[in-house]
């Protein structure tokens, strides 16, 4: 999910450095990211394939144990928080103005195959205005490979409704995790990655699926309203727009609640597999919040000075003021200060090589020093990154003007008219419409 955030930082580093800084990040999902950081082949934990891993879930208990048993240690570096949301494609005129409300137990029954139609009595109880054709099947989307969004959704359903989170027909617990066994009913659809889930919701009528909120918001999908711990119905967009007495929106509030409750380990080398931010209290708190982590080896003594220094510079930027400020552009939240332990982790926990290249950041012009090859300078850039920034600004301006124009159509007597039907008079209708618009 934070792949675009990482890519932007990596490209920024490369554009702003004299030194060649080859950096890549492969967006393959949290589960695969954990596998490739922890192992070089299935079951071989002697080393991993990557210099770092990242995921929106803590390292699983089994992989953490595998790393430990191989004589290695790892650390978790929290760097952002995000919401997992449920989106649907029920036509707006059939949902009604109040929005589609699905309680945790109803969702548990939908995703376990016990509820299969949109007009089920349990759904109608919270949605009296819902007016779908009788017997309309719910087209359920679920991820094929391991994913943090699966982990977040299943963890939430298990935490809130364990008695209903059971496989249809067998009554066996569905379980939790980044990958589980799903029902094989005809209305269940296996998708690959966030793009696959996005296509499922966009292309199938009467579909439901789970995504990180940012993906759904960008596509303007209709969002399911969930009931949070304070019994308030809301969407993730509503939660993100709300601000509590501490200045936190509904996602950040979940992080603060977890810190205040002592749910976040103070030992970055510990097993974090049970850490979650499901169902935290607060009127505007979103109930399915994930923390994103960078996974690092504790022992970096075998790395070159440049590689160790580049890892430090990258994580410095991600967890520092500049990187944290960028997160909102990707629909993520900054982590609470109490969770941001990177400086202490690098200084007191990581075993470093004898020499570490000290990459530094130049924000304001520093003559002579700014030209050093270990300086990542804001005064350098690439044309493509500059042009992209200009296009972003232009697009933001155009979208603002378009929104303003749409909202004021009626002020100018402009009335939209839409129709559909037989193809025979289409040319005649088209000519008449053009004449009316011109006159």
Which role fits each region the language model picked out?
Residues 1-439:
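Flexible loop/hinge segments at secondary-structure junctions
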């Amino acid at each position: 999910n934070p792949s675009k955030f990482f890519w932007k930082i990596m490209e920024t580093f490369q554009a702003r450095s004299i030194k060649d800084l080859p950096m890549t990040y492969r967006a393959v999902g949290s589960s695969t990211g954990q596998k490739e950081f922890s192992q070089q082949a299935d079951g071989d934990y002697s080393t991993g394939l990557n210099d770092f891993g990242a995921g929106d879930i803590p390292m699983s208990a089994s992989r953490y144990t595998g790393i430990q048993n191989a004589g290695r240690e790892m650390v978790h570096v929290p760097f952002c928080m995000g919401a997992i949301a449920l989106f649907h494609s029920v036509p707006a005129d059939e949902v009604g103005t109040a929005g589609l409300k699905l309680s945790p137990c109803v969702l548990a029954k939908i995703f376990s195959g016990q509820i299969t139609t949109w007009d089920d009595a349990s759904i109608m109880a919270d949605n009296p205005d819902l007016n779908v054709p009788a017997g309309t099947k719910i087209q359920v989307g679920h991820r094929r490979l391991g994913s943090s969004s699966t982990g977040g959704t299943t963890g939430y359903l298990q935490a809130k409704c364990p008695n209903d989170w059971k496989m249809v027909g067998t009554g066996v617990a569905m379980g939790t995790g980044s990958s589980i066994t799903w029902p094989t009913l005809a209305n269940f659809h296996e998708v690959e990655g966030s793009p696959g889930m996005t296509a499922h919701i966009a292309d199938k009528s009467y579909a439901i699926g789970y995504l990180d909120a940012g993906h759904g918001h960008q596509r303007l999908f209709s969002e399911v309203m969930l009931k949070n711990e304070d019994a308030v119905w809301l969407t993730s967009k509503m939660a993100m727009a709300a601000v509590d007495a501490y200045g936190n929106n509904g996602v950040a509030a979940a992080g603060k609640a977890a810190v205040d409750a002592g749910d976040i380990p103070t030992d970055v080398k510990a097993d974090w597999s049970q850490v979650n931010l499901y169902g935290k209290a607060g009127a505007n708190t979103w109930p399915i919040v994930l923390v994103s982590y960078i996974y690092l080896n504790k022992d970096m003594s075998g790395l070159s000075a440049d590689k160790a220094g580049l890892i430090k510079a990258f994580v410095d930027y991600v967890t520092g003021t500049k990187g944290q400020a960028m997160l909102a552009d990707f629909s993520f939240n900054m982590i609470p200060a109490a969770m941001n332990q990177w400086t202490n982790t690098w200084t007191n926990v990581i075993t470093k090589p004898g020499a570490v290249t000290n990459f530094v950041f130049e924000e304001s012009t520093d003559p002579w020093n700014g030209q050093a090859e270990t300086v990542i300078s804001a005064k350098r850039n690439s044309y493509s990154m500059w042009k992209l920034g200009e296009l972003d600004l232009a697009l933001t301006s155009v979208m603002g003007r378009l929104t303003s124009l749409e909202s004021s159509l009626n002020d100018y007597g402009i009335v939209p008219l839409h129709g559909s039907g037989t193809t025979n008079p289409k040319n005649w209708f088209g000519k008449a419409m053009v004449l009316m618009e011109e006159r």
